[in-house]
């Protein structure tokens, strides 16, 4: 069975999520092309036609990043396949961000990843999307207008893109990790560290994934040259798989997490760390609940892996 609320959610919608600990925001597209916000502040709410933050082309990717929840940025594609930005600042509310004015043209099948650079109070943004020549392009905001950054080379047309930023305690500046799929269907990582810049090598994290699989990533517990990362993608068994990077072990643990519909998009958020009885993980996806509702998976130290909210509002 479906519900009137679930029927408003686009099947295979782009999904993005941001948080400040367990204060959660989830973004998705409705069947009319509008981008809506559902939120968790002790209980789930919103996600209705009154909670629209902007409009995008139908089937657009949805990416988001935040500084706590004081500054939120949500990225989608226009009908003309240019990047656009919906911005929220506490005290101001939602407005159209400056990225749209730059008219950065991307491939019609481009996905998007977005990060605020970690470890600085400055609002510095990095967006990753696929150009019409199928290369992955970085777009940068450092407070003085949007500019093209580093081109990270060719990728599978329509590849998913995951990204995270963190700051090693012994490094003078933020690090970035991004993941995408290559033409031979490998899932690979590119890495940026402040003392090195972008490393030239691609690190394979999974040998063969379904073409255009969704990719989402998070990191936590940054320490002295140490980090913990979790990367998620939809495998050919129609379940989300998790790939773990743990300090001292590298990429080591890969396995299935939870079933989804074919072609589901995926969003991940985390807070806390192993050192502080964490982390907490939250995954968002579509698994067929009420046909098209967005569903939640939870991991924490106390209870391990389990399904969370079965259907986010408006379902």
Swiss-Prot record:
Zn(2+) binds at residues 244, 246, 252. Sequence repeats lie at residues 2-53, 54-103, 104-155, 156-207, 208-260, 261-315. The keyword NADP does not apply. InterPro entries: Fungal_lectin. Alpha-L-fucose 1 binds at residues 25, 37, 94. Alpha-L-fucose 3 binds at residues 126, 138, 150, 198. GO terms for biological process: adhesion of symbiont to host cell surface via host glycoprotein. Pfam families: Fungal_lectin. Disruption phenotype: Increases lung infection and lung injury by A.fumigatus. The keyword Transcription regulation does not apply. Alpha-L-fucose 5 binds at residues 230, 242. Multispecific lectin that is able to recognize L-fucose in all possible linkages. These could be found not only in decomposed plant matter in soil, which is the natural environment for A.fumigatus, but also in various epitopes on human tissues. Mediates binding of A.fumigatus conidia to airway mucin in a fucose dependent manner. AFL adopts the six-bladed beta-propeller fold and contains 6 binding sites per monomer, each located between two adjacent blades. The 6 binding sites that are non-equivalent, and owing to minor differences in amino-acid composition they exhibit a marked difference in specific ligand recognition. This is Fucose-specific lectin. The gene is fleA.
